[in-house]
A protein has these predicted regions:
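C-terminal subregions of glycosyltransferases and related glycan-biosynthesis enzymes
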Residues: 1, 15, 175, 180, ...
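Nucleotide-sugar donor-binding/catalytic module of glycosyltransferases
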Residues: 1-215, 220
Length: 304
């Protein structure tokens, strides 16, 4: 399939068919055609793409794989086919006409890139603009400390230079594969470039697993704790394997904080108060995916 040095990866899964038209229009409208497009069909029928101006390939995934392992398939495809760049995208989102060209340009100098986000609703109407800038990530990222407590680097607005991927793997039990990927890159000295003038229109729907700045409830709290505990467990294992002592200490403390929170939340009265305090202060404390899951020490600064 390969015709270009850059691969754009999208995943087609049940539920995105109502939005895929916007996605493919944004692909066709890009101000460059110097990329290939790979669509991974996750146990769903192939989409009717219509006339495309770039090289397109589709892979049907019939096995029952986690979202993490499906992304891993895409990453391995890009590496095995000797692509230089891999740009991530979601079929329920779309992006500005310059996103791919600017990503390609900056990936000549940086290990990864991430562009700005506008939040949109199910009807593609803008809810909030320049969201990364507003939640304080309107700058380059070059340290794991910047995404230690939460993540702002998702698989709808990022791209990586594949030369920065060395001996990479994705744990099968990982939930937040994006958080894992960029944490590992940063632990290995990667530098990420913020592109403020390219936009991903990030759709907020009821089906969206995470979304941005959603009200916390019991189910989302349990999911967030599971995400963080799994993330920290796997990063600690990685740090041990690679003798990353400074990072290991930081992540061990974060894991301890999550375990302490998990224990405290067994008291249902406290759980209700915890959720109420988070939601009352969401505008102030929210700064990315999973940032609303606060350890007890941080939570008390809002509760008092």
């Amino acid at each position: 399939m390969k015709k270009s040095k850059t691969l754009v990866l999208g995943v087609n899964y049940k539920g995105v068919e109502n939005y895929a038209k916007d996605y493919f229009k944004s692909i066709v409208d890009q101000d460059t055609d110097q990329f290939d497009l790979l669509i991974l069909n996750d146990n769903t029928a192939s989409l009717k793409l219509g006339e495309m101006n770039v090289n397109v390939d589709e892979i049907m995934i019939s096995e029952d794989k986690s979202p993490a392992l499906i992304r891993y398939d895409g990453l391995n495809y890009a590496i095995s086919n000797n692509y230089q760049n891999l740009i991530f995208s979601d079929l329920d989102d779309f992006f500005s006409i310059n996103r791919i060209s600017l990503s390609i340009r900056e990936l000549e100098k940086y290990d990864f890139v991430f562009n700005e986000i506008h939040l949109i609703d199910q009807n593609s109407e803008i809810i909030d603009e320049n969201y990364l800038y507003k939640i304080c990530l309107g700058k380059n990222v070059n340290s794991f400390y910047q995404i230690l407590d939460y993540n702002c680097l998702g698989l709808t607005h990022t791209g990586i230079n594949l030369e920065s991927i060395k001996n990479f793997y994705i744990p099968e039990n990982i939930i937040a594969v994006d958080w894992w990927l960029f944490t590992i890159l940063l632990l290995n000295g990667a530098n990420g470039k913020y592109i403020d003038n390219a936009i991903t229109y990030y759709r907020q729907t009821d089906e969206n697993l995470v979304g941005m700045k959603k009200i916390l409830n019991e189910n989302r709290l349990k999911t967030g704790i599971r995400v963080k505990q799994t993330h920290y467990d796997n990063i600690i294992k990685y740090c041990n394997q690679n003798n990353l002592e400074i990072a290991l200490n930081s992540y061990a403390l974060k894991k301890d904080g999550i375990l302490e929170l998990k224990l405290a939340l067994k008291d249902l009265d406290f759980q209700k108060r915890y959720i109420d305090i988070i939601n009352s202060n969401l505008d102030d404390l929210y700064c990315g995916w999973w940032s609303e899951i606060l350890d007890l020490k941080t939570w008390r600064t809002y509760a008092n």
